[in-house]
Amino acid sequence: MLKTSLEIKDGYAYITAEGSVNSANAAEFGNALAAVPEDITGVTLDIANIEYISSAGLRVVLNLKKRCGKKPFHIVNASSEVMDVFEMTGFAEIMDISPACRKISVDGCEVIGRGACGECYRIDDETIIKLYYGNADPAFIEHEKSLAKKAFVMGIPTAISYDIVEANGRKGVVYELIKSKTLGELIRMDDSRLDEYVAMYVDICKKVNSIHTNDPEIPSFKEANRADIANVTGITDREREMLYRFIDSVPDGDTCIHGDLNINNIMVQDGECCLIDMGELSVGMPMFDLSRILFSMVYANAEKGEFNSFYKMPSEKVTEIYEKFFRGFFGCDTAEEAEKNNPDVKWLYPLAWFRACMSMLKGERWGEAMRGRALGLLREKLIPFTERECGNMK
């Protein structure tokens, strides 16, 4: 028996279908799809429970696709049998069709990490799953997996990503299990090899920043930061406008940006560095990545004599690592010297001040002391720089 349902949400049509579609009920299927209004903004057809579709059913689907014209049209959750039909007939080449997720269970699996978006479970000796929290947007999950794959293809050393699966009612992405420790862990375990580990840190950052792309599906890091300015709290309208002015003045670029090149996101396997957490892969000028390291190890560092809970080491050790990293990356000790060889270095500190505002002046993660630090950087450093660079506000 064929069952269909139609829901219109914010002008978008969501259709679910169940059963088999053949010549006997194709007309019924067509009548159900004909109920989709002409003024919809797009269509998603969920066929998770469709067991079979004949050529008559395919023509009904094709007719709906033609009615949509250039509007978004997606078919999702096709079973392997139905997906085979779409691929054999060429429909998979003219429509956006996604197969159903493989289902697994994480019952009894070890939790090896938790983050803002979800949890990581060890599936077996070779694979892990990053299982997103239940409210995660499926499009975000697909986007993050796509970025991880693109990073690997472009030559960025990163974990191999497999498929999107469903586990215990939640969606996740299966990745290669990298049997190694992070660069941060190695530094904490053997301080005598600090220079060697910092050299590895420099090398992996240079490798990422040497890769360029014009792939339109990889987002602009600059534009992502611009969009986030609206979420900053506790500043005046003028200060917010200066944040917009600053980011608009930053040069565009086609360099690959990881977005969070800290030593906890770099695994070392068989002497080679491998990056994890590719969700912010973007393009922009290299100073974006380097400024985030500066922000994290200098402006977000604990006070002298205190313990840095993020890096799990004394604040003085974090400072030492950054100073060695800077010297290794630029071949000198100061930004003024580095700028003589690379004019883009003039953006290093301003972008770090900007990052302080974008991180510390949002949400409740940072305490009042850090919010005060960020406001000081905004008012005493970033705004004066922006006024010099762009001119005073009219």
For each predicted feature, which ranges?
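Short beta-strand/loop segment at the start of cytosolic alpha/beta domains
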Residues: 1-16
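Active-site acidic catalytic loop and adjacent metal/ATP-binding pocket
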Residues: 112, 119-123, 243-288
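Conserved N-terminal boundary motif of the eukaryotic protein kinase catalytic domain
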Residues: 103-111
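Amphipathic alpha-helical interaction surfaces in cytosolic regulatory modules
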Residues: 21-95
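An alpha-helical support segment within catalytic cores of ATP-dependent transferases
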Residues: 210-259, 263, 269, 386, ...
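ATP-binding pocket architecture of kinase catalytic cores
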Residues: 110-111, 116-216, 251
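Active-site Asp-x-Gly
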Residues: 269-319
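Helix-rich C-terminal or lid/interface subdomains of diverse kinases
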Residues: 199, 309-394
